[in-house]
């Protein structure tokens, strides 16, 4: 990797694996852009754009948003977001082999190929316990958990004091659909990046500080 303050990576893992906890750590450490497709989609939904309305309908049913929507949104970020000049942490993308191939092609054309794909690995049973208690501060995307990471004041954001919400797709049935979709569509991505030689796996059932240390170790940055 080019310098200690630069990174171009993909963060892979099922819903609730801790991507939302670790990505800000990576963003701060490497001064890179955290490109979270979930946050981008929720921003589009909040603005009521056509893309947002289409995405909300799919997400509320526990499905995954189409390749075309995702590819166009990511390409726009990589082209127009100044923070991407110091690198980027892609979170929630790519989810499929066609997306991974399109991403690789685009990044190679721009002379900024991926350096690492880190997979956060967790058992489904633990994910269910983690995710069904998750609370979100909509304006910032900060996440809490009723059991594992509660806010200082019940149902209030630590920073602003504003109300927290439980996401509408954070219920058991929708979660099972999301995990089934994740396993079916995303696990081939791991094989794809293993073949290209940039994959590394991290046990994400460990405490967050241990997971962070492991990530830095896999990146060769500890």
UniProtKB/Swiss-Prot annotation:
It is found in: Cytoplasm, Cytosol; Mitochondrion intermembrane space. The keyword Zinc-finger does not apply. One of its GO terms (molecular function) is ATP binding. Residues 2 form a propeptide. Gene3D superfamilies: P-loop containing nucleotide triphosphate hydrolases. It catalyses: AMP + ATP = 2 ADP. InterPro entries: Adenyl_kin_sub, Adenylat/UMP-CMP_kin, Adenylat_kinase_CS, Adenylate_kinase_lid-dom, AK2, P-loop_NTPase. Consists of three domains, a large central CORE domain and two small peripheral domains, NMPbind and LID, which undergo movements during catalysis. The LID domain closes over the site of phosphoryl transfer upon ATP binding. Assembling and dissambling the active center during each catalytic cycle provides an effective means to prevent ATP hydrolysis. Monomer. PANTHER family: NUCLEOTIDE KINASE (PTHR23359). This is Adenylate kinase.
